[in-house]
Structure formats: C-alpha cells, structure tokens
Swiss-Prot record:
Cited Pfam families: DUF520
Superkingdom of the organism of origin: Bacteria
Organism: Campylobacter curvus (strain 525.92)
Signal peptide range: none
Protein's UniProt name: Nucleotide-binding protein Ccur92_01650
Entries under PANTHER family matching the protein: UPF0234 PROTEIN YAJQ
Cysteine pairs bridged by disulfides in the record: none
Its job: Nucleotide-binding protein.
Keyword annotations of the record: Nucleotide-binding
Amino acid sequence: MASEHSFDISAQVDMMEVKNALETSKKELTARYDFKGVTAQIELSEKDKTITILSSSGNKVDALKDIVISKLIKRNIPPVALSESKRESASGGNIKATLKLNDTLDTENSKKITKAIKDAKLKVTATIRGEEVRVSGKSIDDLQECIRLVKALNLELPINFKNLK
C-alpha cells in the first residue's frame, strides 16, 4: 500500500462530440417553424475553436445559441465550455455571434487549483504540467477528496479528471 496514486486534471472538450451536437442543432434548425424562411447558420471552426452563429435578429441568435447549448449538454459537454466572445452586425442586416470553446487549462486556473489543494492540507502534491495538473498521493481517499474540492471551485472550464492510477 506504499505505492503512489495519481490523477490528472485537465480542461478538454471532445471535438467529435461538439461536431455531433452542431449537426443535431442544424437538423433541429431545419425542422423548427420559427426559423422557416429566415437566415440562420451554425458553423464550427476547429482551427480557432469557435462556433459562429448567424441570424436575422438578436432574438433568433439567442434562440440558436440555446439550441446549441442544449445539444452540447445532451452530449455531456458543460455550458461553461462556451463563452460568447463577440456579437456584431453582418452583411444583409444579419447579426453574427461568435462562441469560443474554452478547452485549455491556463496557468492562472492551474495556480488556483494547486493553491486550493495546498490550502486544504491534504496529504497530496499538485504539480502543473503544461495544460494539466498532476495530483499524486498515497491515499486514494485523499485523491477523491481533491476531486470533490476541485469540483466545488466552480471554475468556468469543463474540468476533466483522468488517469486515476
């Protein structure tokens, strides 16, 4: 029982699930009566990790955003994975909204996580490794307590726990 146990904390979004959610959103868009004869588009840019929503009015853009979020939730992607970066006028009197996928654990949030773990005085060590935080300790119970602690932080990121060994 003297062996070391560990797990990794990261913030990643499964892009295949995002694609599937956007495809089902587009299918719902074609079936909805309130979008008949109205300009409405949903596009994904994998390179920039953004979702672009285009429609004729602000209310329609909000409705499209709600559709996308509901489909992402059904695919187990939390709504905190999206943040609206900008809303602007587009050609033809349309409105364009850009949603950014938050899927990287930056150094600021990594430091928040490691500080919270150290302040909890659990018998574990947390180290920042690029875009993830490695937590290691001798007791699996302490590691599970760390998972509960990080979930309680309510960070605006889709936090994932993986590689529990």
